[in-house]
């Protein structure tokens, strides 16, 4: 691996891209009002002083602001990519040059380099891990068990990662507590529902220049991401079709006014397909074979296993690359979850935890403050009524 010319150990495309990255980071920061508030508190209180953090996240301008916030809270932070395709090389360069944050990420890096970068991040001997898909935690528990002793806790950002970590906890192999940031109500609201919904539509349109109005838009999965995507696709004029394996979510989709059917049925009808399930083989060779000529297939889940890419490769007569892009959202829950883990790790078990309700509500309150919105508070009389049982109708 190559390293940058700075003394800070990193592996990036090159520091010559840092000027553009610096502008991107500053631009993203303007719209991250909640993180700005948290960063000011972190600078003042230094809650992460002495902590080493290894973060395996999308290396984007938004994530850069999270890393800067953690550093300003006293942490020693290194960052590696959770997805080789999402890395913004200019942002990585600016983090190294301008913010003294170690980065191991190069856009489009091959599989070997990707995992070598995770190993390099673990050489940092972290006290806290931050993950987006649980690859770093998995490597730590399998190939780098020597680095486990100093770890006091971690956070996980995605549904896919939380599923993997809960499986590890169930088997008794998870060696430290993890806060599932993905399960926070504010994360569902800002990131999964509204963030993923908008950014997925934006990505499809930017890549294809396809007119959604009047098209049949098939969405596999009606979780938080699927709901947000369905809402945005309908808003763009598409006829939305939902496929699901969970009867409750399928019923919810139907009651929300969407057509619900199996993927086998939907494959024959759709103009655009998007998988948001967190599972594998959602769109298979059999589905692809019956799709319309020119159908658009996309995935907004974390890994690329939801679509049978190997089968698609074999069926394709040629390939052509179009434009690349990515958007990321809200990191307030991540930063506060790290602070929570540092303060409470000694009392936590080796399992996956939800974000504490008081922390989640704090993020919501900070967001409302940043928007200039005020809400009512319960009166003492109302609090007493809610807590009691003797007063009836």
Briefly describe each language-model feature range:
Residues 2-48, 79-215:
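Glycine/serine-rich phosphate-binding loop and adjoining beta1-alpha1 elements at the start
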Residues 121-122, 265-266, 290:
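Structural alpha-helical scaffold elements that stabilize or flank donor/cofactor-binding regions
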Residues 57-75, 187, 191, 195-280:
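Glycine-rich phosphate/diphosphate-binding loop of Rossmann-like nucleotide-binding domains
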Residues 17, 55, 130-131, 274-275, ...:
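Redox-cofactor binding/interface segments in oxidoreductases and associated redox assembly factors
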Residues 66, 90-92, 116-117, 138-145, ...:
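Short acidic, glycine/serine/threonine-rich loops at helix termini
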Residues 52, 67-86:
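Active-site cofactor/substrate anionic-group-binding motifs, chiefly glycine-
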Residues 81, 128-133, 144-160, 279, ...:
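ADP-ribose/adenylate-binding Rossmann-like module
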Residues 2-9, 17-34, 48-52, 56, ...:
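Adenosine-phosphate binding glycine-rich loop
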């Amino acid at each position: 691996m190559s390293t940058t010319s700075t003394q800070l150990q990193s592996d990036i495309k090159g520091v010559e891209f840092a000027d553009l990255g610096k502008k991107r980071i500053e631009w993203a920061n303007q719209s991250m009002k909640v993180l700005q508030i948290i960063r000011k508190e972190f600078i003042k209180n230094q809650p992460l002083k002495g902590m080493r953090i290894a973060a395996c996240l999308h290396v984007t301008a938004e994530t850069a602001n999270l890393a800067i916030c953690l550093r300003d809270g006293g942490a020693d932070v290194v960052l590696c990519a959770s997805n080789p395709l999402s890395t913004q090389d200019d942002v990585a360069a600016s983090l190294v040059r301008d913010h003294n944050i170690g980065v191991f990420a190069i856009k489009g890096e091959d599989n070997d380099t990707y995992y070598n970068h995770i190993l390099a991040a673990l050489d940092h001997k972290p006290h806290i891990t931050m993950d987006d898909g649980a690859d770093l935690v998995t490597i730590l528990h399998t190939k780098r068990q020597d680095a486990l002793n100093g770890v006091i806790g971690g956070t996980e950002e995605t549904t896919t990662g939380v599923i993997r970590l809960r499986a590890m906890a169930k088997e008794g192999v998870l060696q430290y507590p993890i806060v599932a940031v993905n399960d926070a109500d504010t994360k569902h609201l800002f990131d999964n529902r509204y963030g993923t919904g908008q950014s997925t539509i934006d990505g499809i349109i930017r890549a294809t220049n396809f007119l959604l109005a009047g098209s049949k838009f098939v969405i596999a999965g009606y979780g938080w991401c699927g709901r947000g995507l369905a809402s945005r696709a309908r808003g763009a004029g598409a006829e939305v079709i939902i496929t699901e394996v969970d009867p409750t979510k399928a019923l919810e989709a139907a009651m929300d006014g969407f057509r619900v059917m199996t993927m086998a049925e939907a494959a024959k009808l759709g103009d655009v397909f998007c998988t948001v399930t967190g599972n594998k083989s959602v769109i298979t060779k059999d589905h692809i074979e019956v799709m319309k000529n020119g159908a658009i297939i996309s995935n907004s889940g974390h890994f690329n296993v939801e679509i049978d890419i190997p089968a698609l490769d074999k069926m394709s007569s040629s390939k052509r690359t179009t434009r690349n892009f990515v958007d990321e959202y809200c990191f307030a829950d991540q930063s506060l979850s790290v602070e929570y883990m540092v303060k409470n790790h000694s009392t936590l078990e080796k399992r996956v935890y939800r974000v504490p309700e008081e922390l989640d509500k704090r993020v919501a309150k900070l967001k409302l403050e940043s928007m200039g919105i005020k809400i009512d508070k319960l009166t003492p009389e109302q609090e007493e009524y809610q807590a009691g049982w003797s007063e009836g109708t």
